[in-house]
Amino acid sequence: MSDNGWQLQHSTNKVKLYSRKVADSEFIQTKAEVKISTAVDDLMLMFGDGSECLQWQKRCYSSRVIQKISEQELYAYSIIDLPWPVLNRDFVFHSLVTVDPLTKTTTLTLSPANNIYPQTKYIRATANISYSVQVLTASSSVLTITMHTEFGGSISPRIINSILIDELQDDVDNLISLLKDN
């Protein structure tokens, strides 16, 4: 077990995937640490502006901006497509980009903001997600993705927890592939 309860689930030269239990939740939290060999500006383009799904996230069905506060802050509404027989979920996020010039780290934080958008036909889930990009050199960086989701509804945490690492691995692989193609 690593610091703060993180357990290494998968490791390669460029990707490390972790999981850990979260107090007061039946769903695990996941983390990816990814060494990226591309310019940070190219990597940041992969996060879009909230107006559509990120190309590299396979479960995203739709996404749109509800309210843009500034270039660094907005509210977004997203729907994820879950495998049958699980029903799709929707999310309302507060999205905030911050930059720490000392550590050369840019962080995109997504946190629940359910109160600003009405309930829909989908089961409302909540998630806390962080994407941090730390610049190492002009052409390399480390991306750290941390996420924890409360899926809501009647869904088996055991089943969901069993696929979260594989789903994160797929998304990371998709991101790396897109970066190579650009």
Stretches found by the model and what they are:
Residues 1-182:
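Eukaryotic helix-grip
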